[in-house]
Amino acid sequence: MTTSVPPKLTVVWFKRDLRLQDHEPLHHAVSVATDKGYPVLPLYLFEPDIMADPHHSERHWRFVWQSLLAMQRTLQAAGGELHVSYDNAVAFFRRLIAAHPHIEVVSYAETGLHCTFERDKQLSALFNRHDINWREFPYAGVQRGITHRRTWHQRWQQLMAQPALSTDLHHPHWYVNKSMVNRVPGDIAARLHQPDDSKQPGGEHHAHKLLASFLTDRHTHYHRNISSPLASFNSCSRLSPYLAWGNISLRQVYQALNSAG
């Protein structure tokens, strides 16, 4: 008697790459899903240990929250669901593995803090014990493990010259199971959901809108106003938070800048 093996579940773990286009791990997962019929689980974890790190503040997590809401709207329109869980990563993946032993995890390689480095070491050990493949894609041209910089510039230029990835999100292989997630505590969710008009809003759409306005007209007096705390507010790109949290890719900005001349 032949026992059927359930299809492998591909987990796309979003961290500081909160966008749905020019996203290599997501593009890979969707391509595999289309080719082999594997379901795809988009995932973001609000990790209490990471949130408590002094490098972060509530304004960072509010930006993340807004970015996730924008992603959720787009995914739901395509029949998918972004699974957002309030969990330490090891605890979540232990629970997921117990329910779905056949998984693959794809993400960007995070260049972050000591706490994320330690988290990644624990996760690698967990995945190795369960013979789970965790594929980490290089992020923003960062080249890990190289012993010299002689070819760094050439490789970076090659990466930036590659076409930005456009992913068709309308396919039938999204995995949706909200029972796997722990809801963000109500008091935290309420604070993060509270708008703050004095801060830049998170989201892929806002990043591209800001880039377009900079390339169209705001750049005109950049060289004059860069040193002025008041004037630089409008003359600078103001893309820092969008690049930091991955609402837009470095390649998208680089190519848009080159196209604008």
State where each predicted segment sits.
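Short catalytic/ligand-binding loop motif for oxyanion handling, primarily in non-cytosolic enzymes
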Residues: L20, I50-M51, L113-T116, Q143-I146, ...
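A short helix-to-beta-strand connector/capping loop
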Residues: Q76-E81, H130-I132
